[in-house]
């Protein structure tokens, strides 16, 4: 029903715009009443004038409306429409309202009835947006159909030339421009009026009336069994047959559904090109004029039944939908391409601006580089002049330095020789100091041993004195104890003798230790003498060493051999170092 409402709206739009004289989008209420009444009549919808008054009650003066006619049209008319009205009568009513205002006054090669059919075809092929137009692709499709119906050859180059001259500001033609295009004979040159009219009628029957095929054939009666010629018209779900092609006297219908079938029959009873249409309750036997017509009708009926089984629309409507979908897809792709082109153009403009900015920066940089190059050349000349002067001065200084180096090399060699001698003396002094340190250690060891022996000797002497006192006390004891004490005295005498022997031994060891101490003391004196001798030699040779260094205005120390090679601070530092070493040893 949605597709039916869209098709009805196109014709109603023409009628409404024809009533809108000042093109304000509004029509007076009285005109809308007439339009609504006529629509309800031709569409076989109950008319309710009270609903119209109620819908527009807020604006009783002048043109309507604040709420608009479209909501009323949808609610009270289009939603109630059933597919039981006469489409030709409906289109004729809308055509009558708009034709006088819009149809060109120029003479046309087609009749007004043909113009009406072109107008209906326009509504079928136009885009689903308002104001209604037919795009060049659909114009080409329609003109091809008309040319084929007229039996002529399609001139593609002529149509391409027409498209080139097409107004770029327009996306397509209006209904009245299409009527004028077909009516002026631009694409039907050499064809008479009758041929053009027949072609328009044939295309109208196919696209609007859904006539898939039509023509004369013989039909066998069900009661009398006689054969009668009839004009057959095949539509998507019915085959109607008439007395003649003027369609005035209809004799019957063959209702088609998915259960019907068509079969070819062999020739019989003098009838040729026979085929059979089997329906639910009846079977129709038909004879075509020749084998070609028979095959065409069988194929057409079979295709129609197949479409009914699939639930598909008629071929021309399905083809129209495919073309629209293809155009939508192409339009979407074109819009996407235009969007990408705009993005690329914007990016290109940004790049151009960036390049222009870079060019300006490069020019500025080139200008600065030229100035800097000029300054650099000037500076280079100055530097070369200065360098030449400096080079000459450096050569002179280098020559003087070479002479000084030669002189200093000789002095350095002497200095190095003295340093080597001093190093040897330092090594010998270190050995002497080591001997002195070892002698001191030996002396300390002997001294500790002698002290230990003296301590043991005093301990023994104290013990002997104690024993002597005890012996004296024992002598003074009673006679009863004398014998026992005598025995103890004898034992103690023996112990005393042993202690005396140990004491003598300790005395001997003390004497030996004293002799060792005297020997070590002599060694220490000799080591001290040697250390003093080496120190004197080192001091003597250090006085001979003088570092090669630039002259100084500070006062020098004077030695027996001339100016000293060290300062007063260095001398004090060395004396401090020697004193610390001596204290440590």
UniProtKB/Swiss-Prot annotation:
**Coiled-coil positions:** 316-529
Its subcellular locations are: Cytoplasm; Cell membrane; Nucleus; Cell projection, Lamellipodium
GO annotation (BP), single: positive regulation of actin filament bundle assembly
Query: Which superkingdom does the taxonomy of this entry point to?
Result: Eukaryota
Q: What InterPro entries does its record include?
A: EF-hand-dom_pair, PH-like_dom_sf, PH_domain
Major localisation? cytoplasm
Under the heading SMART domains, the entry gives: PH (SM00233)
Keywords, A to Z, come to:
Cell membrane, Cell projection, Coiled coil, Cytoplasm, Cytoskeleton, DNA-binding, Membrane, Nucleus, Phosphoprotein
Matches recorded under Gene3D superfamilies: Pleckstrin-homology domain (PH domain)/Phosphotyrosine-binding domain (PTB)
Q: Which GO terms describe its molecular function?
A: ATP binding; DNA binding
Q: Where is this region: Disordered?
A: 347-373
Domain PH, by residue range, is 210-306
Q: Name one GO cellular component term.
A: nucleus
Mod. after translation: Tyrosine-phosphorylated.
Provide ranges: composition bias, Basic and acidic residues. 351-373
Summary of the tissues where the protein is detected: Spleen. Expressed only in B-cells that have been induced to switch to various Ig isotypes.
Reported function: Phosphatidylinositol 3,4,5-trisphosphate-dependent guanine nucleotide exchange factor (GEF) which, independently of RAS, transduces signals from tyrosine kinase receptors to RAC. It also mediates signaling of membrane ruffling. Regulates the actin cytoskeleton as an effector or adapter protein in response to agonist stimulated phosphatidylinositol (3,4)-bisphosphate production and cell protrusion.
| Domain description | The PH domain is essential for phosphatidylinositol 3,4,5-trisphosphate binding.
Outline the subunit composition. The SWAP complex consists of NPM1, NCL, PARP1 and SWAP70.
Q: Which PANTHER family match?
A: SWAP-70 RECOMBINASE (PTHR14383), SWITCH-ASSOCIATED PROTEIN 70 (PTHR14383:SF6)
User: What is the protein's given name?
Assistant: Switch-associated protein 70
Lineage, top ranks: Eukaryota, Metazoa, Chordata, Craniata, Vertebrata
């Amino acid at each position: 029903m949605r597709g039916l409402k869209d098709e009805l709206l196109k014709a109603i739009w023409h009628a409404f715009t024809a009533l809108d004289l000042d093109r304000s989008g509004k029509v007076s209420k009285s005109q809308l009443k007439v339009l609504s009444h006529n629509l309800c009549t031709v569409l076989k919808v109950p008319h309710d004038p009270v609903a119209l008054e109620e819908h527009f009650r807020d604006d009783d003066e002048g043109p309507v409306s604040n709420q608009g006619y479209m909501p009323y049209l949808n609610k009270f008319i289009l939603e109630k429409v059933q597919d039981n009205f006469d489409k030709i009568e409906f289109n004729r009513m809308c055509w009558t309202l708009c034709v006088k205002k819009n149809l060109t006054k120029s003479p046309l090669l087609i009749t007004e009835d043909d113009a009406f059919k072109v107008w209906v075809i326009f509504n079928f092929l136009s885009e689903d947006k308002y104001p209604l137009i037919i795009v060049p692709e659909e114009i080409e499709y329609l003109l091809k159909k008309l040319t084929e119906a007229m039996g002529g050859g399609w001139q593609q180059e002529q149509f391409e030339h027409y498209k080139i001259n097409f107004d770029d500001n327009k996306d397509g033609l209006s209904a009245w421009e299409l009527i004028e295009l077909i009516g002026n004979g631009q694409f039907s040159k050499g064809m008479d009026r009758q041929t053009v009219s027949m072609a328009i009628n044939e295309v109208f029957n196919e696209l609007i009336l859904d006539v898939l095929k039509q023509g004369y054939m013989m039909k066998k009666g069900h009661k009398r069994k006689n054969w009668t010629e009839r004009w057959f018209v095949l539509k998507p779900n019915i085959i109607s047959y008439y007395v003649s092609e003027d369609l005035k006297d209809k004799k019957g219908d063959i209702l088609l559904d998915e259960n019907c079938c068509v079969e070819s029959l062999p020739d019989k009873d003098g009838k040729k090109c026979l085929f059979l249409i089997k329906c639910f309750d009846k079977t129709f036997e038909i004879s075509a004029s020749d084998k070609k017509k028979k095959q065409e009708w069988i194929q057409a009926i079979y295709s129609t039944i197949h479409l009914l089984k699939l639930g598909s629309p008629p071929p021309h409507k399905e083809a129209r939908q495919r073309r629209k979908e293809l155009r939508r897809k192409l339009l979407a792709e074109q819009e996407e391409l235009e969007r990408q082109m705009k993005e690329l153009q914007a990016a290109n403009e940004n790049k151009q601006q960036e390049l222009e900015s870079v060019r300006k920066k490069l020019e500025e940089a080139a200008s600065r580089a030229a100035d800097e190059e000029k300054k650099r050349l000037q500076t280079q000349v100055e530097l070369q002049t200065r360098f030449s002067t400096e080079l000459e001065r450096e050569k002179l200084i280098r020559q003087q330095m070479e002479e000084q180096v030669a002189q200093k090399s000789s002095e350095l060699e002497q200095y190095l020789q003295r340093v080597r001698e001093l190093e040897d003396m330092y090594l010998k002094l270190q050995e002497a100091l080591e001997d002195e340190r070892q002698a001191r250690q030996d002396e300390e060891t002997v001294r500790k041993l002698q002290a230990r022996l003296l301590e043991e000797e005093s301990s023994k002497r104290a013990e002997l004195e104690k024993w002597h006192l005890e012996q004296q006390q024992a002598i003074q004891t009673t006679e009863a104890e004398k014998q026992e004490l005598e025995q103890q005295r004898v034992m103690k005498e023996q112990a005393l003798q042993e202690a005396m022997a140990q004491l003598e031994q300790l005395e001997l060891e003390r004497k030996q230790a004293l002799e060792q101490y005297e020997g070590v003391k002599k060694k220490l004196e000799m080591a001290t003498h040697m250390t003093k001798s080496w120190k004197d030699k080192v001091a003597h040779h250090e006085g001979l060493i003088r570092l090669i260094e630039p002259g100084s205005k500070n006062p020098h120390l004077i030695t027996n051999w001339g100016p000293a090679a060290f300062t007063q601070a260095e001398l004090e530092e060395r004396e401090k170092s020697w004193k610390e070493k001596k204290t440590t040893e």
